[in-house]
Amino acid sequence: MASSSDSEDDSFMAVDQEETVLEGTMDQDEEPHPVLEAEETRHNRSMSELPEEVLEYILSFLSPYQEHKTAALVCKQWYRLIKGVAHQCYHGFMKAVQEGNIQWESRTYPYPGTPITQRFSHSACYYDANQSMYVFGGCTQSSCNAAFNDLWRLDLNSKEWIRPLASGSYPSPKAGATLVVYKDLLVLFGGWTRPSPYPLHQPERFFDEIHTYSPSKNWWNCIVTTHGPPPMAGHSSCVIDDKMIVFGGSLGSRQMSNDVWVLDLEQWAWSKPNISGPSPHPRGGQSQIVIDDATILILGGCGGPNALFKDAWLLHMHSGPWAWQPLKVENEEHGAPELWCHPACRVGQCVVVFSQAPSGRAPLSPSLNSRPSPISATPPALVPETREYRSQSPVRSMDEAPCVNGRWGTLRPRAQRQTPSGSREGSLSPARGDGSPILNGGSLSPGTAAVGGSSLDSPVQAISPSTPSAPEGYDLKIGLSLAPRRGSLPDQKDLRLGSIDLNWDLKPASSSNPMDGMDNRTVGGSMRHPPEQTNGVHTPPHVASALAGAVSPGALRRSLEAIKAMSSKGPSASAALSPPLGSSPGSPGSQSLSSGETVPIPRPGPAQGDGHSLPPIARRLGHHPPQSLNVGKPLYQSMNCKPMQMYVLDIKDTKEKGRVKWKVFNSSSVVGPPETSLHTVVQGRGELIIFGGLMDKKQNVKYYPKTNALYFVRAKR
């Protein structure tokens, strides 16, 4: 014990000595050292010591929604700077719109939250109290008899879709309604829905219901009124003070309206004002813009078949009788086409419309690639589905000519005739033993054309209704392989630049069994698969159709151009290609299979015959097509895709000079993603939000969500 106590005393003495040394060191450090103090001061600076210009520039990168609100609570200086940043954000965006100096941002899968269902003809508005965009109803392209009555909220701070499960009296499922903001309420009016499929021949149903939704209470309420407008859809509405002004709309049975109705939002009573002078033609689908508290602008609309309007009218709401005033539209040739299905939104002294680009052949916006995705730059790899695809897979409608490499067209079938060998010319595929490459999942059908001096006499086949179409998520390339591609979305049918999709005008066909020679054939001839398991795609052993007619030379020329486009990408791409049409066994332009069959090999080179070459955009892009933000796929599907462009209407001289003027832009930044119609455009804080819409089937674009796309338009930095 004594030894232990001695050791403890020694340890205490050592600790005391260490403390004494430390105290001496601290005493020495307390002596002033000007150099050390300056160094310490330089490394301990805070953001408050930064120049306000630098701090303001840093704060400008914050989101104009919740992040601005949070930053303003830091201190008085930040509160003052945030107010200036918000002012610059708003006015900078207005200036960018006037000059066409904008940038596009796309939100594609995967993004946070539950994905909203694809839809068009929906209603949307911006609610600033919770910094969200609300979307109600609409209908979907996949089910023509279905409409929605769901309500969705897009949190513009987190870009997350949220579905409020509200209580109260829900509206009916409908599309074509209007949704406006009044104080702390969202007011929903009108709309229509398709009838149920049974019994047949029922008319569409139109609504005159008024519902209000309270975001704070999460409650729907039905408002009962009397002596109001007839049931309508496709009308326009806006709120001025405590009045909701409604104009036009479709009444059903091909009837349009040009009446003006006013709803008192305090008393919930309808009235119809007296209006003097000429009035606009009855219409629906127009845009209604508030100029000031006593003036409303009506733009475009549709009055029925072959009655599309591009005019502009002012409604003066004076104390006396209201009056209509037609406006002169300048630079109408540079204006937005089809104003009836592309809504307008006011930004400062301009009205913005997103519609089809004038030429319809302009490349998609390069500004979509200007910044990485804010959600996920490298999305997780998606595993392709492994289920079997049977022959009843949906086949492209015969009346829809595909968009192939920038051109529209179909291959017309060739007439049959019996050959001495007993095989048919013009049948879906050759007799057993002929080597015929598969083109987009089908084989090649006979035809002749001159390519570089050689004749074309290879079998050519198109996809018939009895032949399985390409399963979703598969890359349709020229060759015998239909392997699924990693990272492709399950609901995509990928068509890269150079791939071909053939349509035929089918005629009554005779029974044959042309696919027997192709069921168990692979490129190397070393693998054998049963018909239902070949490359994961079911190939029916019996195809009971034979085509009559001749192959279009123009379509064959386009097919050859597609082969050259793919072969120009390098040896790896050329190895997967089918050989050129018309080669015979043992010829220089053929490759022998292990089974003794021969298929031609493509010979890359300049375009021949008609002098066509690769499209200019393909030559300019070379081996590096533009990439989308998230999926990493080319932004365009073919050169004939219709991009969406921003059109700007100057309205500053509306009241004084009675005219509006379309601006002319030379910048490519106004050209954006593929065109959609019947979408919604909502103005947020320093940005425009475009959601949903109906995409043209003939655009053949596979890398964008078809009708639930979400785009943001902001000022370019």
Curated annotation (Swiss-Prot):
Show the ranges annotated as biased composition (Low complexity).
363-376, 570-596
Its GO CC terms are:
SCF ubiquitin ligase complex
Question: Where are residues bearing Phosphothreonine located in the sequence?
Answer: T378
> Where is this chain compositionally biased, Polar residues type?
416-426, 455-469
Q: Kelch repeat ranges?
A: 132-184, 186-242, 244-293, 295-342
In its UniProt record, a GO molecular function of this protein is: ubiquitin-like ligase-substrate adaptor activity
What is the residue range of the signal peptide feature? none
Q: Which UniProt keywords apply?
A: Kelch repeat, Phosphoprotein, Repeat, Ubl conjugation pathway
Annotated InterPro entries = F-box-like_dom_sf (IPR036047), F-box_dom (IPR001810), F-box_only_SRC (IPR052821), Kelch-typ_b-propeller (IPR015915)
Write down the SMART domains for this protein, in alphabetical order.
FBOX (SM00256)
UniProt superkingdom = Eukaryota
Compositional bias segments (type: Acidic residues):
1-30
Q: Which residues carry this modification: Phosphoserine?
A: S365, S373, S552
Q: Where is this region: Disordered?
A: 1-34, 361-474, 570-631
One Pfam family cited in the UniProt record for this chain: F-box-like
Q: Which residues form the F-box domain?
A: 44-93
Give the function comment from the record: Substrate-recognition component of some SCF (SKP1-CUL1-F-box protein)-type E3 ubiquitin ligase complex. Specifically recognizes p53/TP53, promoting its ubiquitination and degradation.
Q: Subunit comment for this entry? A: Component of some SCF complex, composed of CUL1, SKP1, RBX1 and FBXO42. Interacts (via the kelch domain) with p53/TP53; interaction is direct.
| Name of the protein | F-box only protein 42
